[in-house]
Amino acid sequence: MNFIRQGLGIALQPELTLKSIAGELCSVPLEPTFYRQISLLAKEKPVEGSPLFLLQMCMEQLVAIGKI
């Protein structure tokens, strides 16, 4: 990020990263908007109640209602 602060370049950053540097740099949304696919990988099947299990359930619900 220092090279951007020095005016030496640009970078494509995830939205969460942009929130942490708000005010320091200028962000410009890309047109057209694009998204990336995020996958969950685990060696074993998630145990009920574990963070991975809860995240998997959340992802499945978002897919079911058409949010992702």
From Swiss-Prot:
It comes from the Bacteria. NCBIfam families: PRK09729.1. This is Putative protein YfaH.
